[in-house]
From Swiss-Prot:
This is Nucleotide sugar transporter SLC35D2. It is a multi-pass membrane protein. GO terms for cellular component: endoplasmic reticulum; Golgi apparatus; Golgi membrane. Belongs to the TPT transporter family. SLC35D subfamily. Nucleotide sugar antiporter transporting UDP-N-acetylglucosamine (UDP-GlcNAc) and UDP-glucose (UDP-Glc) from the cytosol into the lumen of the Golgi in exchange of UMP. By supplying UDP-N-acetylglucosamine, a donor substrate to heparan sulfate synthases, probably takes part in the synthesis of these glycoconjugates. Residues 1-27 are annotated as: Disordered. The keyword Membrane applies. Its main location: Golgi. The gene is SLC35D2. GO terms for biological process: embryonic skeletal system development; heparan sulfate proteoglycan biosynthetic process; nucleotide-sugar transmembrane transport.
Amino acid sequence: MAEVHRRQHARVKGEAPAKSSTHRHEEELGMASAETLTVFLKLLAAGFYGVSSFLIVVVNKSVLTNYRFPSSLCVGLGQMVATVAVLWVGKALRVVKFPDFDRNVPRKTFPLPLLYFGNQITGLFSTKKLNLPMFTVLRRFSILFTMFAEGVLLKKTFSWGIKMTVFAMIIGAFVAASSDLAFDLEGYVFILINDVLTAANGAYVKQKLDSKELGKYGLLYYNALFMILPTLAIAYFTGDAQKALDFEGWADTLFLLQFTLSCVMGFILMYATVLCTQYNSALTTTIVGCIKNILITYIGMVFGGDYIFTWTNFIGLNISIAGSLVYSYITFSEEQLSKQSEASSKLDIKGKGAV
């Protein structure tokens, strides 16, 4: 009887590791499928942002340069109104959810509304003033500023390879700018301000999303809502509102279609930016924007109508483009390695706990 008891006890002890091994294998499969879904969502969010960012630059350029619409402020105002209207209707239909307004909302959003307003208006103004190739190459300064912002706000560090590719992009931008025959000082100043605001906005959006107080829809809604009246007041006192009302192109159906698309794309781009930042990072969002800018650079050379070719400018543009491609590859590779090491360390910890 004692022998039988010992055998049963030994059998039970032998089964425990097998059960533990099976359980661990199931956990590994579950984590692998979750990892695949996460990567897919990240790529989808990045692709959505890239397409949205491309379309809004092309449409805004057409409205402000080709049709010579006189007010960047009023285009920005239209984008804010469209954002608020779409999200308000979405909330009423229970398609989206975000917190109702209370006295703590301004504190929870600050300083994003100011950054959003500045980012939007400087972006529109520089789009109007600069040809598309120079607009896109100067936008690469936003990567440098994003690195600073994430370093200060999110305490991130960057590898030597990342720093060198950013340096190459900036050198390329300086070379291209040195022989820009269509040089416009106001355009250059506004695009550099826009780069700083883009970097700060991306880092703060990531910080606010991590706190989970308002969510992505709440941030979008209140950013636009808080800046409608200030933008309207600025447009009125600067005379931009009157210029927009006096514009002769309102009777043109094609212009109306593009203006409406510009307003709606403003909301879509805001949503895509927050979505990409949420699933990836502020830096990844900036990278996707730069890859999109490569396409816009070459399209702008051929179809933009305001690009003046010089070899020095062309070489500078391509140095910056090459730097952005290598930069994107290094950043993506580093991010994947980081995720894999985190996943393996979690598995090791769980494996030790199961033994």
